[in-house]
A protein has these predicted regions:
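Elongated alpha-helical scaffolds
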Residues: 62-69
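Long, low-complexity, Lys/Arg-enriched
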Residues: 1-57, 69-104
Length: 104
């Protein structure tokens, strides 16, 4: 089995080191021109997530609009999204299955 990827929106000022126990961190850096343009944001994230797999994870952080678009893309492609949520000084994995019939 290949190592899972952990997608992170932006680099922020957070310490993501605990998330490394779940897989390789992949930073999705959004250019300033796409930051507030949802259509461009969608295209940037589609490109950044091109190598995503159904078992990869997404850290919930950054702007809410960016998290929403990233979640929508992953659900569209895989029927689910695997979140990493920071709670009690560590990351926890949470899976949201919306359409179990989608196969990747």
């Amino acid at each position: 089995m290949t190592e899972r990827k952990v997608y992170v929106l932006g680099r922020g000022g957070h310490d993501y080191s605990d998330a490394e126990r779940f897989g390789k961190l992949v930073f999705l850096d959004i250019p300033n021109y796409a930051r507030w343009d949802i259509d461009r944001l969608y295209r940037e994230l589609e490109e950044g997530l091109a190598d995503a797999d159904k078992d990869d994870l997404f850290i919930v952080s950054h702007l809410a609009s960016h998290c929403c678009v990233c979640t929508a893309i992953l659900i569209e492609w895989f029927g689910r999204v695997n979140f990493l949520i920071y709670r009690k000084d560590k990351y926890e994995e949470h899976k949201l299955v919306v359409n179990p019939d989608v196969e990747a």
